[in-house]
């Protein structure tokens, strides 16, 4: 009788050739994963965006209309990274924007938040007189500096990565949670 009960249970069990629901789910998931495009292709299709926190403008940094390369060029960079206080524009080198793009690609983020790019000399002087953390020989009035952050990336982690990759100045502002990069000589400092 025990043999009959065991035979009945074995007859009802699924045959090994029939995959279980779990096996079918895992196989479908693996197929979907292998059909995804390569990461390099995704980067080409999806631009990196910059959001200017002072002017509330959003522009593509990469792609055919991007500020790093392409049709926008120097005029587009000058307009986007302009002084928010005077609306004065200064030359922002493509090499500076390329550092920001490299950081975004390294940390796999699609948005960069810009705090400050070109800073008009009068505005820089005003900040100095108010006692703000502004260098007397700041690179911002020359158009050679950008303050920025990457959402979802710790400012310290971004700072440490930039120290190893960027050949210019790198400043770290842990309380304000942003970093400064410029094209002057290699140096580093810590602000608030």
PLM feature spans:
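Envelope-exposed proteins and targeting segments
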Residues: 44-46, 77, 81, 108-110, ...
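Extracytoplasmic/secreted envelope proteins and their assembly/folding machinery
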Residues: 96-101, 124, 155-159
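Charged, often glycine-rich, active-site loop that binds/positions anionic groups
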Residues: 123-136
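Catalytic cores and adjacent binding grooves of peptidoglycan-active enzymes
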Residues: 16-17, 51, 133-192
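Active-site acidic/histidine clusters and adjacent loop/turn architecture
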Residues: 62-113
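Acidic helix-start/capping segments at beta-turn-to-alpha-helix junctions
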Residues: 110-125
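A mature extracytoplasmic/lumenal domain signature
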Residues: 52-54, 63-65, 116-118, 150-152, ...
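N-terminal secretory targeting signals
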Residues: 1-52
